[in-house]
Amino acid sequence: MLPAKMVTTAFELPGYRVSANLGVVRGITVRSRSLVGNFFGGLQSLFGGNITIYTSLCERARSETYAEMCQHAQALGADAVIGMRYDATEVMTGLTEVLCYGTAVKLEPLAGREPNP
């Protein structure tokens, strides 16, 4: 997987210049909660606050899509992903699509500057 420092929501990386744009890369997953999970999530919502069952589901979905996006970038020979974003859409009741996307790029160190580690 690409090092975390080489994936950014910014459109540039300090100490580097983009030498080639390899295109959009993405990871996608569609998730649903089990009937039991929905029941306990519903109970938690009665008391307010953080709904931990859904929080952990969302975090797993984001982690999976991030890893898939990074694998896609590596398959293209990318050095980094810039402009990374997440998006989530309810496909139908109980099913949520999570998308992680960005632009895969090749980088060159800037002349006379040490790249930011």
Swiss-Prot record:
It comes from the Bacteria. It holds the Pfam family YbjQ_1. InterPro entries: UPF0145_dom_sf, UPF0145_YbjQ-like. Belongs to the UPF0145 family. HAMAP family: UPF0145. This is UPF0145 protein CV_4322.
